[in-house]
Amino acid sequence: MRNTSRVAILIVIVGVLLTLTHDYWGGKLLGIFSVLISCSVVFIAFVISLENRKPAQTIAWLAVLGSFPFLGFLFYLLFGRNYWQQRRFKKKAESDEAVLLKFQEPSPIAIERLPMAPHQRPLLHLAYRIGQHPVSLASQTAVLTNGEETFAAIFDELEKAQHHIHLEYYIVRHDEIGQKLKHVLMEKACQGVHVRFLYDAVGSWKLSNAYIEELRAAGVEMIPFSPVRLPFLSNQINFRNHRKIIVIDGGVGFVGGLNIGDEYLGKDEYFGFWRDTHLLIRGEAVRTLQLIFLQDWYYMTGERLLTPEYLSPPLIVEEGQGGVQLIAGGPDQKWEVIKQLYFAMITSAKRSIWVASPYFVPDEDILTALKVAALSGIDVRLLAPKRPDKKIVFYASRSYFPELLEAGVKIYEYEKGFLHSKVIVVDGELASIGTANMDMRSFHLNFEVNAFLYYTDSTNKLVNDFLEDFRHASPIDYVQFQQRPFRVRIVESVSRLLSPLL
């Protein structure tokens, strides 16, 4: 399969060269190229059918290949190859499993001590079974609302670091906030603190070499996650590390929606105010966040750091703060962990489901769960951005609005600035904060990490944040929304058609 893909890429290159030298060859060899492309397309269509993907994905791929053979062929090479994905991440999955079996303690005892309703307990058992990380009762959490509050807390904790600082980010910029982070990390490295920084090679592709080299010269280990040497000839532009993790001395951790960049402080002229949510964690649950980082670090460097100095019991926090569970999702896992936990949260609801997601492109399972909940009389609300970030995703999201509105889902468009929070609150008792959007990319392609909260004070804070956000949002009226121009509907429909491919 891998060799076939490389041969197919060679066919494309030859075709381009033949096109550029058309006058010289007289077009004689273009017929051969057309036959090769046609055979490749037929072969790919056959492979897609045998992979037993979801019907929506299969139909979308076959439609694109049939309508635009050449473009569809290229698109498949970049985004569609499941076989190479599975083979590529098999080794990571095996090493992750070995670490978990050695270092994770059983979770059912903690689950039984949580004061949860009987209908909610299956969610915890599911999370432990497919997520493989325990629920912690000896942890404290604090919701950090927006950039100023988040970065203030991060820098305050970084200054206190004595042994190690571990960072993992999708986007890192060398702007004002990025420079501030660089100077703090260089200072801590000079003090003898071990600083390890894993950044995504695609998300941070604009990060300057000078920035990286300055940190390395100061003793900071800067490692790119899954570098892409030939982005147009490799589907490595998918399967990105979308996680945002900081672990300090094994006892303090951060996770959430904010990357490292000035736009997250509202300094971008287009976006303006940036609405986001992050989470500060202290205590036992940080150990899980540490494990997730160390697994990713080992995958990229081959360096095992599974020693007591990194995995010893963290700061003692008394029980009684509710439960905290860190769950990692990614293409290296057998189950669609984040999606299945979202689904379980939605179907466990008795009173309310409030969702904030900047990129809302659900699959049929999540879409049906939301509609059924609303039709059952549950208060289902979706908070989405009114200002587009990625236009194709924005229009694809809006294509789902009519059927959701018709089912009784209340949809609000955030108007104060750009909404980037990735939060779910169910019945005011269960919540999720993290890096995963409610879209197919987060469900199937990206490496993500979410914190699931059970009966914590932080959940109450999230409810209050939602109420404040609704004040700065406008509800969408179903009748008025149906009157949008026909050309807009076409764009939405095409974007939605492409969404299973992206």
Swiss-Prot record:
Record GO biological process: cardiolipin biosynthetic process
Residues forming the catalytic site: 242, 244, 249, 420, 422, 427
Family that this chain belongs to: Belongs to the phospholipase D family. Cardiolipin synthase subfamily.
Superkingdom, natural source: Bacteria
CDD domains: PLDc_CLS_1, PLDc_CLS_2
Spans traversing the lipid bilayer: 7-27, 29-49, 59-79
Record-level GO cellular component terms: plasma membrane
Sequence ranges assigned to domain PLD phosphodiesterase in this UniProt record: 237-264, 415-442
Descriptive protein name: Cardiolipin synthase
Organism taxonomic ancestry: Bacteria, Bacillati, Bacillota, Bacilli, Bacillales
Listed EC numbers: 2.7.8.-
Free-text function comment from the UniProt entry: Catalyzes the reversible phosphatidyl group transfer from one phosphatidylglycerol molecule to another to form cardiolipin (CL) (diphosphatidylglycerol) and glycerol.
Membrane topology, as annotated: Multi-pass membrane protein
Keywords: Cell membrane, Lipid biosynthesis, Lipid metabolism, Membrane, Phospholipid biosynthesis, Phospholipid metabolism, Repeat, Transferase, Transmembrane, Transmembrane helix
Cellular localization per UniProt: Cell membrane
Major place of residence: membrane
